Amino acid sequence: MKTSIVTLLITFCFYLSVYAQAPQDKATELKEQALSSLKQKDYIKARYLFKKAYEAFAVRENYPQAIECGIQANALYVRENFYKEGFELCRNMEQLIWTGEQKQNKVFYDLRFPISKERLQMYISLKNPAQAKNQLDKLEEIASLAKNDSLMEVLLYTNCFLY
């Protein structure tokens, strides 16, 4: 009787630990499936999975992974000329970053930068030089505030691409 209770208790604890890890694994699994779909050139499925992975990482407050997946989904929106959805996703990502900054009392320049860069790419694709210039100025401001050499390097390459 005692061994069956102990066995039942151990099994219960094991299932609890597996269940607790499931949401993180689900987000990672979605990201891996999205990468696989992208590799197979199934862009619609990849976009859907990247967006779901973005949402799953956002719920877990894993901001770097969420933004990475959001940027991938946005690039696939732009690839299909879904600019309205792309701009909406950028707004959602910026809102997520703002919420995270408020919770952690620090500014995530390294996460704001790729969102602004993605928005710049959309304005370039839309042939809107005024808004592209505004986004470039915003990128320069973010890079200077971040004091991060890798962001400055990306900014230089982005400037070269623009001109």
How would you describe each model-predicted region?
Residues 19-163:
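A "functional boundary" signal
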Residues 1-27:
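Bacterial Sec-dependent N-terminal signal peptides
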